């Protein structure tokens, strides 16, 4: 999550959308007083037991959760900033995103669960990004960049915000196998149920072949 006062934008960092890399790139355009989750300390009222333990034993202060929701960010910055700044995020095909999540969270595990086993135990909120960029069930940002067209849409947003043209050039777009090769009917249906809002909002559909390269 980033709140940049100089360029008057708010970036809502979603899951499995190259959010950390985009946030790192955007952070180079920020200055003192801006809010960057990777470098901004969390308020003590947001601490979890583990945060208190690290503070007491190591003197380490917790950083902000990267995946702050739109509602949490609005509460932090206030209505005036929230309503006047350009707000954006990135969304990804739900089935593609689920496969990427599986790859990340099961890498190195032995034995490694199958994707069916992983999804059967996954919390629905871990599969859907919609709660992060909506408030009370309604879209709360000005632009949702489609991960399928990430490079072109990031460039367009950068131009809109007068950011340096080379800002996003170092970002690498991660590739996974096409989801139709690993998801069966049960897994497809589970993801459809968890991600129903974004599927309806953006018209996502289950594709049997890989789309063109980004």
Predicted region positions:
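Membrane-interface amphipathic segments in extracytoplasmic regions
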Residues: 1-214
